[in-house]
Amino acid sequence: MGIKHLYQIISENAPDAVKSGEIKNQFGRKVAIDASMSIYSFLIAVRSDGQQLMNESGETTSHLMGLFYRTLRMVDNGIKPLYVFDGAPPKLKSGELAKRIARKQEAAEQHEEAKETGTTEDVEKFSRRTVRVTREHNEECKKLLKLMGIPYINAPTEAEAQCAVLARAGKVYAAASEDMDTLCFDSPILLRHLTFSEQRKEPILEIHLDRVLEGLGMDRKTFVDLCILLGCDYLDPIPKVGPNTALKLIRDHGSLEKVVEAMKNDPKQKYTIPDDWPYEQARDLFFEPDVRPADHPECDFKWEAPDVEGLVKFLVEGKGFSEDRVRSGAARLQKNMKTAQQSRLEGFFKPVAKTDEEKASLKRKHEEKLEAAKKKKKEDAKAKREAKSRPKGTA
């Protein structure tokens, strides 16, 4: 799930933190990818007639199809991917996981009912909600990656946290995930939409944490407190606290401790904090996650030549893939992994730190942008109200 509405908060309040571009702009970069999130998206997206792809034996192949071709696309564009798999979830996450299982069970029942009485759209909608990544899916994907020569590592717990460690250490350029909580784990750069299909035509979003903090005017602790208040995987959200309210509360009070105190002392009792809401533990999980240091032997990785015959045996003979396409894909891997060895020119230069004067200028420009956006929003709202109040037939 990640952090609710965080991207909205960033795009509205720290727009300079987000760069949008094509996949080819990532040429020559090593990227740590949240494997479980990617596999889940493949199971949902790679479908035929509302159903997951299957071979003649009835085995699901959507995850393998997605992983094979999306990884090829990255390598074609000069990216060197490293996949990071989830380990055991933290205990604090068990409540959220239990809710997800319950929702999937409910969706499975609705899916069966929709097949009897609903439309095609209903069937597909409920079918997608039943999807979950199994241990077998993960093991098959690891086998495929090994045959492709693409490295992977297993995280002790949260994959996003391990990706962030590698990014901070400079072993990879960025962490890639759709989960915005990757920023809470202190990844300097987050890439979104990297594993999306080309057909979706979604730009790659590159989010820089230092610019997020600068744009919001927060340090990391305050930012993490904001994210917990917005709603994360570890805690139930506080009812009636939406994105704008969460941002205002954190800005007004400065920390979750003071926000909670203000809520409890509010004579109107506007907000009801859930009985079990251990926000300190949630914060600790973001600041001290169970991860391996970047120099740990299990965090060593390298890209190798693909095992062409192994790929044919696994995908063609075992899973019913087209042999021509698999061999063609293997040839692309062999060719493009060599191209990806080239370094980006930017790698030879260190960024120059901004002066206080430059920082003040950037902040002033950012505030002017926000003010202009607010003014336009008010003017648009006023124009809409006036348009509604005019009698019909008048210009």
UniProtKB/Swiss-Prot annotation:
Mg(2+) 2 binds at D179, D181, D233. Residues 1-104 are annotated as: N-domain. PROSITE patterns: XPG_1, XPG_2. Keywords: DNA damage, DNA repair, DNA replication, Endonuclease, Exonuclease, Hydrolase, Magnesium, Metal-binding, Mitochondrion, Nuclease, Nucleus, Phosphoprotein. Phosphorylated. Phosphorylation upon DNA damage induces relocalization to the nuclear plasma. Mg(2+) 1 binds at D34, D86, E158, E160. It comes from the Eukaryota. CDD domains: H3TH_FEN1-Euk (cd09907), PIN_FEN1 (cd09867). Its cofactor is Mg(2+). Residues 356-389 have a biased composition (Basic and acidic residues). Residues 122-253 are annotated as: I-domain. One of its GO terms (molecular function) is 5'-flap endonuclease activity. The keyword GTP-binding does not apply. DNA binds at R47, R70, E158, G231, D233. Belongs to the XPG/RAD2 endonuclease family. FEN1 subfamily. This is Flap endonuclease 1. The lineage of its organism: Eukaryota, Fungi, Dikarya, Ascomycota, Pezizomycotina.
